[in-house]
Amino acid sequence: MSKSATSHFKRLPKGQNGGIELLLIHNVEHLGRQGDLVEVKAGYALNYLLPQGLATIATDHHKRMVEKHREKLRAIELEKLKSYREQADELAKQSITIEANANDEGHLYGSVGPHEIVDALKASGITLAQDQIRLEGPLKELGLYTVKIHLHSEVDASLKVWVVPTVAAEGGEPGAS
């Protein structure tokens, strides 16, 4: 190694473990995501990350910027979490009714799944995605069910779902004389 390369290497900021502290400019598999502060061995930094433009030397200025950005993201995440918890409280107060064809014993001819629950919620003015509805299996009988709704990784809600028989048209059940 030449004298200038050695002196250049000595000027690089060292991390706590003797490696070089870098700020990732792009996501790097098995290392971190864009904006992460990472510590890597000098060879990895000098021969790959820096020449490829995947990272830059982490200065005190960069560290302050990253910390400010993380604080903003934490505040935004806390607001989202608060909003999801409020939505969960509202959903817990709600109940929806879904009509389905059933036999005399209360067994449904079909079943009620996430699609039907989302449609019933949409009719009530609540928009959710089908993958947020957590059922152990389709609902196949008449009755009251408590359905889990996944709003956020830290927030789940409960919703009461009534599955009731479809009201027959005038004259009673089809096929009745």
Curated annotation (Swiss-Prot):
Highest taxon listed in the record's lineage? Bacteria
Which UniProt keywords are present, listed alphabetically? Answer: Ribonucleoprotein, Ribosomal protein, RNA-binding, rRNA-binding
Asked whether the keyword rRNA-binding is assigned, the reply is yes
Question: Pfam families attached here?
Answer: Ribosomal_L9_C, Ribosomal_L9_N
The record's InterPro entries line, in alphabetical order, gives: Ribosomal_bL9, Ribosomal_bL9/RNase_H1_N, Ribosomal_bL9_bac/chp, Ribosomal_bL9_C, Ribosomal_bL9_C_sf, Ribosomal_bL9_N, Ribosomal_bL9_N_sf
What are the record's GO terms for cellular component? Answer: cytosolic large ribosomal subunit
Give disulfide pairs as residue numbers. none
Q: Name one GO biological process term.
A: translation
Q: Name one GO molecular function term.
A: structural constituent of ribosome
Q: Does the keyword Phosphoprotein apply?
A: no
This molecule's function is given as: Binds to the 23S rRNA.
The UniProt entry's sequence similarity note says: Belongs to the bacterial ribosomal protein bL9 family.
Please report the name of this protein according to its UniProt entry: Large ribosomal subunit protein bL9
Q: Which organism is it from?
A: Rhodopirellula baltica (strain DSM 10527 / NCIMB 13988 / SH1)
Q: Which gene encodes it?
A: rplI
